[in-house]
């Protein structure tokens, strides 16, 4: 967003030296941040791509306490009409599974939600989102079928539009 000249603020959790690295890089790029600090270190994920296959190794996340969860909810509760909230990734095990729905319900009318997640978490949180962004593998996983043509992909995206999602972007991975 900053590269497009759009002011934004990064919210979430950070911990330890990896959290400091993230905050410094955001600062260097002119992006405001307001993270909730946790004990431990922000997890490191590694992706290995050997042209025909991508392997992901996900590190362990720090524990998110109820107090830390409430601090982040408080920060998000300050969003206003016409703000955009991006909810991305999985939900850590220590946080209620319905947190995305809870956040959506507390936002003022006119706040847009961009949802970038997968599987049941995506299915359970569709109503009224401004944008969702599954990749082709996530779409195939969700519908339990291979999507070989653009027409197949468009047909499956109708499912989201029927659930009041305003925009769907399907990234094609390495294709």
Model-inferred region functions:
Residues 1-41:
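Substrate-binding N-lobe of the ribokinase-like
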Residues 12-13, 37-38, 47-49, 58, ...:
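Short beta-strand segments
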Residues 36-44, 65-68:
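Gly/Ser-rich phosphate-binding catalytic loop and adjacent alpha/beta segment
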Residues 48-81:
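Conserved phosphate-binding/catalytic loop of the ribokinase/pfkB sugar-kinase fold
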Residues 98-175:
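Conserved phosphate/ATP/ADP-binding segment of small-molecule kinases
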